[in-house]
């Protein structure tokens, strides 16, 4: 059974592993576990910045997505940015990504976001097809 929750500091080592899978696919990023840990910790420790949502199967993290908050000058209100969506290879095609996105959209609404912007790399055709 897949459960969806907000990430905690204890989840960071597993999140770094997932990010490294993602960054191997994205040409513009290099793996840097130290910086990844720092960024993850900054988001997790400050709910005003955003939230990292995780999917767990049998208590093991199998997916994640970041929902970051910022202010839109065009809309004059808070907006959400969704990025770093990754599901482990063995957990794909099981609805994990859909559950993560559903939670991200729900949290964006609960946090009064006027819109959500999704970031996906131009050459990540698999992700574009999913969305």
Predicted region positions:
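Acetyl-CoA-dependent GNAT
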Residues: 6-12, 17-77, 83, 102, ...
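Conserved catalytic-core motifs of GNAT/GCN5-like acyltransferases
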Residues: 69, 117-121, 128
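Short coil/turn motifs at secondary-structure junctions
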Residues: 70-72, 90, 123-125
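Conserved acetyl-CoA-binding loop-helix of GNAT-fold acetyltransferases
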Residues: 87, 93-106
């Amino acid at each position: 059974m897949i459960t969806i929750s907000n990430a905690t500091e204890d989840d960071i080592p597993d999140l770094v592993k997932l990010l490294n899978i993602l960054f191997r696919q994205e040409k513009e990023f290099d793996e840097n576990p130290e910086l990844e840990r720092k960024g993850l910790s900054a988001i997790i420790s400050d709910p005003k910045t955003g939230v990292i949502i995780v999917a767990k199967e049998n208590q093991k993290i199998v997916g994640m997505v970041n929902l970051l908050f910022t202010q839109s000058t065009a809309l004059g209100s808070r907006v959400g940015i969704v990025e770093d969506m990754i599901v482990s290879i063995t957990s794909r095609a099981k609805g994990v990504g859909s559950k993560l996105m559903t939670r991200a959209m729900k949290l964006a609404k609960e946090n009064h976001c006027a819109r959500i912007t999704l970031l996906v790399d131009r050459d990540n055709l698999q992700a574009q097809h999913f969305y």
